Design a protein with these regions (language model features):
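Positively charged n-region of N-terminal signal peptides that target proteins for export
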Residues: 1-5
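Bacterial N-terminal signal peptides
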Residues: 9-19
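Alpha/beta-hydrolase-fold serine-hydrolase catalytic core, especially in secreted/extracellular enzymes
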Residues: 26-121, 286, 293-402
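Cap/lid segment of the alpha/beta-hydrolase catalytic domain
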Residues: 130-215, 251-267
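Alpha/beta-hydrolase fold nucleophile elbow
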Residues: 215-227
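Glycine-rich nucleophile elbow surrounding the catalytic serine of serine-hydrolase chemistry
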Residues: 225-236
Length: 402
């Protein structure tokens, strides 16, 4: 069992380039001062140097597995409380709608929706493997904040990700954030004050939806998303232990807390009782398999020397340090481009026991996406003139009752 000294050394030794200046003491005092009210930590709320000091403070609160589990439980409770999901709301009927199956090479796509709360619909697409029998792994694919007519779950890179995973045997659900895709089409705005609550709850209910389908293995649930979808990935994994494998992409950072109110607009990171950051929240995945994918061109640039060593130390308490990995692309920028998908696929194959036959080129190690069909936005939509949205759907922008 490793000691606190080891935990601190893992971060401090790995980051010789990030020296904490003496003048930081006063500034740091303001950051650590306790307040009766929760504090919102948004965007670049603290510097990289302050993040290292914070990691040291947090590591000082535990030195063994029992103490880490106790802290993890407090973090989990703080996330749910801050998101106004504590206690967890009653599971209301999903009333799922799945329609318009399209068959392609090795997989099918269907348009789908369910009610996360009465009248509040979550829209998405189901990708399923063809020619596979028995229960299959289920994978959730939340999306990031990319806008435009083909933004969110409608993006070609999101379709490639889902189709490729389905061709390898997974049942994949790609779904809208509030105010994106079909949600935006029907009038919802991403600035909805309950966005963080709604998206976290929608992700929890998305697991319920997968498990209700009848062909998904309840014990093999994975989730992967990029940017804002990366935030959803580690928040969901932190609060719902049904997730067995997680791959957050270009989002796990000790110094960046998410720039959108749907990520950091509610007090999930800092209260008078406890401070945390997204690096530590991602560590709540332990001891389940976790892969961090990071780049040199955004706030995940320090992953190899800061976030990964901190998280791996926690996996060491479970004696499973090999279950957390990272792939770092020092010369690349933000996004879920092909290189990042190629880093994610083998991790999902390994831990969800997917079958890459017909997709993976064993000679080159490349997962072939050329067999995927990129669909039009109109095809991806769940409701249209012939299939209107149910009349009891909430008016766009309405407060959602919990």
């Amino acid at each position: 069992m490793r000691t606190l000294t080891t935990a601190l050394a893992a971060v401090a030794i790995a980051l010789p380039a990030l020296v904490v200046p003496p003048s930081l003491a006063a500034e740091e005092k303001d950051k650590t001062a306790k307040d009766d009210k929760p504090i919102l930590c948004q965007g670049h709320w603290q510097s990289e140097a302050q993040a290292i000091l914070q990691l040291k403070r947090m590591a000082a609160t535990y030195s063994n597995l029992k103490e880490w589990k106790a802290r993890a439980a407090k973090i989990r409770t703080q996330i749910l409380t801050g998101a106004k999901l504590n206690p967890l709301p009653k599971r209301t009927p999903l009333n799922p709608i799945v329609r318009n199956k399209r068959s392609y090479k090795g997989y099918t796509v269907e348009s789908a929706a369910f009610e996360a709360r009465p009248g509040f619909f979550v829209y998405g697409n189901l990708y399923r493997p063809l020619g596979r029998k028995g229960d299959r792994p289920g994978i959730l694919c939340p999306h990031g904040h990319a806008r435009g007519p083909e933004g969110g779950r409608l993006r070609p890179d999101q379709q490639h990700r889902c189709a490729t995973l389905a061709r390898m045997g997974a049942v994949v659900f790609s779904y809208d954030m509030v105010g994106f895709g079909d949600s935006e089409h029907f009038g919802w705005n991403h600035k909805h004050p309950q966005a963080l609550t709604l998206q976290t709850w929608s992700s929890i209910r998305a697991i319920d939806f997968l498990q209700s389908l009848g062909d998904v293995d309840d014990e093999q649930i994975g989730v992967t998303g990029c940017s804002g979808g990366g935030t959803q990935t580690f928040l969901l994994t932190a609060v719902d232990d049904r997730v067995k494998v997680a791959v957050p992409v270009v989002m796990v950072s000790a110094h960046f807390f998410g720039g959108c109110h749907c990520e950091s607009g509610m007090p999930i990171h800092k209260t008078a009782a406890l401070e945390t950051n997204n690096c530590e929240i991602a560590a709540l995945t332990s001891p389940r398999p976790l892969k961090l994918i990071s780049v040199g061109g955004d706030w995940t640039k320090n992953t190899p020397k800061v976030e990964f060593p901190y998280i791996q130390n926690i996996y060491g308490y479970y004696e499973k340090p090999s279950l957390v990995e990272y792939s770092h692309f020092a010369d690349e920028g933000h996004g879920y481009q092909l290189s990042k998908r190629q880093a994610m696929y083998p991790f999902m194959v390994k831990h969800l026991k997917l079958d890459p036959k017909g997709v993976l080129n064993k000679k080159t190690g490349v997962f072939d996406e050329t067999g995927n069909r990129i669909e039009k936005v109109s095809t991806l939509r769940t409701f249209d003139e012939k299939h209107p949205i149910p009349k009891h759907a909430l008016k766009p922008g309405s407060p959602v009752k919990f």
